[in-house]
Structures are given as structure tokens and as C-alpha cells.
């Protein structure tokens, strides 16, 4: 939790309150910040604090480690292709039970415990997300976002609730799909014209040298990000995250951020300080 001194400092900065009052921020939550209880507590307290000072946060989550744990308990061997979980029907059943029934409700309870008001959802609720199959049929029930309906989200955030969304949705026939949580967050941010899309990761951000954290690129445009991808400065698992940011920016999101979720209070440091701590992408 923030100290009283830190809270007073933020709350006394009228420019911050004016700048962000009623603005929507969509946060994709994953990585070490989900596995480490101390980091988890900090993320939750940051969310609640941001809602207290007038922002309207929305949390989107996956839950890979928890899924793997329960697959192991049920003697189901996880399979991956190029880092993407191959999702047959038994795996899809576990994914949905774990993300919607366990991880999501644990996050909701944690937010409520720290003084916020939260509602847990999946993409199925209120037709929030309509899915379609991935263009890679060998991945099984891995889906893409076909449509986003934000009516339910708008009702919730306009009444000071913090929506927590599991990245599971269904197609028009009712078949469940496992969708990348970055993608879900980006599409929701775009549809809501969010002020910020924030991806919490296990890296400092976009680095010129992947092995040197001091080479962090703190600010870049869409074109600069594309150029860095062409020259392989942006590579591997960072490519889909950057592409997600680019898509959301192209659809009206004001800024997209890739942060190190292993840093205490990473959200507040990025949003409420001039220098930030991660990589910010803008149009």
C-alpha cells in the first residue's frame, strides 16, 4: 500500500487529478505480478487507488501458471506451439474453469478486500466479446476477437466498479475459446477509446539490447516501433505485445505502455510520474 505521505502527495497534485479524472485505462495483468503475492497486493492497491482518484480502471487477465497447475493435477500434458497454448476441448474446459471460476474471483475478492468495488466477468458476459477461431486450426480452441460490446462495461465503470475480465469468450454458436489476454485488453481499450492501454510484463519494456536493461526505450511512435521490428530490435515474445499496442493506438487509444510488473507499484510510477518506468508508444 502507499504510505500516507505518498497518498497526500498525489492527491495534492491538482494537475494529475484534472488530467486523469474519469479517464479509462485498460490493464493487462500477467507474469510475475500474478505469481508473487507481494506484487499482486501492490497491483491491486494501485488499481483501487487509481479508482479513488477518479480514473476508471479495467483489468484483463490470463493465468497460465494456474492453468498449468490444474492440468498437471488432472494428468493433462500442456502443449505449446510457438509459445501459444494448444487448446483441445479438455484443455479448454480447464482453462475456462481456472480463469473464470478461480483466478477471476480471487482478483475480485482481493480488490473488494482493499476497499474497491469489483465485478468479475468473462468475454461471455453481456456479449462482451464474440470470438472466432484462430486462423491456425492446429491450435484447437484458440480464438481471436471478432466483436466487442462495451455496454456492460460502461455501466460498471460509470458506477465506480472495477471490471475484472477473464480472457475467455464464445463464438456465435456458443463454443468457448481461449484468447490471448493482451489481445482482449487491446481490443477493449480501442472500443472504449481508452486513455491508456497498459501491458504488465516480466521485462523492463522495449530494449535496444535485450540483455541490457539500461537500453530501455522509454518513448516511441508507431512508425519507430515498426522500424525496430523490421530490424529485429523488437523480436520474440515482444513482437505480439508491440503489435497489440499498435493496433489499439491505430483505433484511438491515446497511449500504450509496456511495463515491468516486477517493480513495486509499477502502475502508479508509470501513470502518475512524468518520467514513467516503462516503454510508452504513441501515434
Curated annotation (Swiss-Prot):
It is found in: Plastid, Chloroplast. GO terms for molecular function: acetylglutamate kinase activity; ATP binding. GO terms for cellular component: chloroplast. PANTHER family: N-ACETYLGLUTAMATE SYNTHASE (PTHR23342), N-ACETYLGLUTAMATE SYNTHASE, MITOCHONDRIAL (PTHR23342:SF0). It comes from the Eukaryota. GO terms for biological process: arginine biosynthetic process via ornithine; L-arginine biosynthetic process. Pathway: Amino-acid biosynthesis; L-arginine biosynthesis; N(2)-acetyl-L-ornithine from L-glutamate: step 2/4. This is Acetylglutamate kinase. It catalyses: N-acetyl-L-glutamate + ATP = N-acetyl-L-glutamyl 5-phosphate + ADP. Substrate binds at residues 63-64, 85, 178. Its EC number is 2.7.2.8. InterPro entries: AceGlu_kinase-like_sf, AcgluKinase_fam, ArgB, Asp/Glu/Uridylate_kinase, Glu/AcGlu_kinase, NAGK-C. Catalyzes the ATP-dependent phosphorylation of N-acetyl-L-glutamate. It is an enzyme of class 2 (transferase). Keywords: Amino-acid biosynthesis, Arginine biosynthesis, ATP-binding, Chloroplast, Kinase, Nucleotide-binding, Plastid, Transferase. Belongs to the acetylglutamate kinase family. ArgB subfamily. Its main location: plastid. The record marks 28, 241 as: Transition state stabilizer.
